[in-house]
């Protein structure tokens, strides 16, 4: 009997592992974003929930925030820093919202381009249905020292990062 129970659990686990997940199809055609082959118009908001008198992001109010976003007609959230919490990503997906995930150039090694750790995030979450596309950069004009003051160095970094992302994840656009 124990062997049969163990076999049943193993069979169930294998079945779950091989059940395909439903991921929305995202593509750019000309100047249009298509989601599941239908035009997708971004009605978005930048979201970085830092409570008053705090300096770090806190998702304690995520349920309320998502409800307010939906009531306002928002369908897309742009985040400045990747969310490394599957439960939060699942809540965003369950709310029917999509994410534009931004990667900074130098974020002290936390999912940034300089350290290359942004690729770890993409590997981990590229199949999550909340992801609409990846975004490289935010306000780089404030940090020319990152590129020795030469804009061509920035263009080269963007080109390399885009190529690496497309190798890992051909299913999401890069902005």
What positions do the PLM features span?
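Positively charged n-region of N-terminal signal peptides that target proteins for export
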Residues: 1-5
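Bacterial Sec-dependent signal peptides at the C-terminal "C-region" and cleavage site
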Residues: 11-25
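Active-site mouth of glycoside hydrolases
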Residues: 28, 32-175
């Amino acid at each position: 009997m124990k062997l049969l129970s163990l076999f049943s659990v193993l069979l169930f686990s294998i079945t779950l592992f091989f059940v395909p997940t439903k991921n929305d199809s995202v593509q750019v055609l000309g100047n249009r974003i298509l989601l599941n082959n239908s035009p997708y118009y971004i009605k978005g908001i930048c979201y970085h929930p830092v409570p008053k008198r705090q300096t770090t992001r806190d998702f304690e109010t995520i349920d309320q925030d998502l409800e307010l976003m939906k009531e306002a007609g928002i369908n897309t959230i742009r985040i400045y820093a990747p969310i490394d919490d599957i439960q939060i990503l699942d809540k965003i997906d369950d709310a029917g919202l999509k994410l534009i995930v931004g990667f900074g150039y130098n974020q002290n090694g936390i999912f940034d381009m300089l350290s290359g750790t942004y690729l770890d995030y993409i590997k981990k979450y590229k199949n999550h249905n909340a992801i609409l596309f990846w975004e490289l950069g935010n306000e780089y004009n404030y940090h020319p020292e990152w590129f020795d003051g030469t804009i061509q160095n920035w263009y080269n970094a963007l080109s390399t990062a885009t190529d690496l992302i497309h190798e890992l994840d051909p299913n999401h656009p890069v902005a």
